[in-house]
Amino acid sequence: MNKNKLERVQQKKRILVAPLNWGLGHSTRCIPIINALIAHGFEPIIASDGLALELLKKEFPDLKAIELPSYNITYSKKANSFKLKLIKDSPHLLKTIKKEKRAIESIIEDENIFGIISDNRFGVRHKSVPSVFITHQLRVLSGSTTWLSSKLHQKIISKFYECWVPDHIGTNNLSGDLGHIEGSTSFIKYLGPLTRFKKLNLEPKYDVFALLSGPEPQRTFLEIKLLKELENYNGKVLFVKGQIENEQKIEVKNHITIYNFMTSKELEIALNESKMILSRSGYTTIMDLAKLEKKAFFIPTPGQFEQEYLAKKLHKENVIPCCKQDDFKIEMLETLKDFSGFKNEEYQVNYGKLFS
């Protein structure tokens, strides 16, 4: 056997893991999958762009990381303009998907890729390599055009080998109508919620943990509003901006401790040490808080139908209170006593079977 063939035999099977760079949720929910791949003898290669890529590089400094073409997804300043902005940006998105496909062809050849795991990146797939798509949105809400956006999304998903949904399959689920549809679902696998965190028995250190995330400019708008409101809060506050930068920065303003970002381990400890969480209603955040059985107050990203739906669903189920971004007042946190908070349903992802 020649040297090149011997190297290929001895080499661990390489799996490309590529989350979408839209907020930090797609990248953070890939962390337990990457850890599981390593534990099962695979060699993950990370591929993304922007903050999502930077976050995973900090979490896995020893893994190879590849930059993919950027979708450059941002929110409009006005919530009611979000759908129009997506329509306007669609030619750029389609061009980016084509660039992604070309990039994937090169990566597969150069890196000897055995499998692909794409978290909501449409162009990260290849007909010669088993490619799976991770999403909690089998149904994509878009107001009056939900039927169209859902059909288009399902058509894209059907081009993948499998679709992994990070939720429970039964009625006691987190994603509701988003992650559960009628009809042929033979290629859909329900993993159970994905989270990088564990529940720890720690004494409370913070009364409120304000955890920010999501695309600009809405992330900044929420940061400004919450910092102003929390000035008048009578309690100890931890505030994480969700800005991934080269160096961690910590600032203390009276009763508020402000971080630009935290590592996964720091977040795990901080969440466990906090009495209540103030955040967006992103699905990854919901999975994390369900695992930790936390109480939370949600402020959905303006104009994002998915987050608005999830917040209203959980409010209706008496799990959490929520409100619109412009309406939030610090006094609203007092309503948490009237809600149950999250309860965890024990489960374990069978990664061995999943990766087989």
Language-model features, listed with the residues they occupy:
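Conserved nucleotide-sugar phosphate-binding/catalytic loop shared by glycosyltransferases and other
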Residues: 11-14, 21, 39-40, 44-91, ...
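A short, glycine/small-residue-rich beta-strand->loop->alpha-helix junction that serves as a flexible
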Residues: 19-31, 217-220
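Short amphipathic alpha-helix
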Residues: 27-37, 52
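Donor-nucleotide binding loops and adjacent catalytic segments primarily
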Residues: 34, 178, 192-276, 286, ...
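Conserved nucleotide-sugar donor-binding subdomain of glycosyltransferases
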Residues: 81-123
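Leloir-type glycosyltransferase catalytic cores
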Residues: 88-93, 319-356
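A nucleotide-sugar donor-handling region in carbohydrate enzymes
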Residues: 135, 140-217, 240-245
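Catalytic binding pocket for nucleotide-activated donors in carbohydrate/polymer assembly enzymes
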Residues: 285-286, 290-332
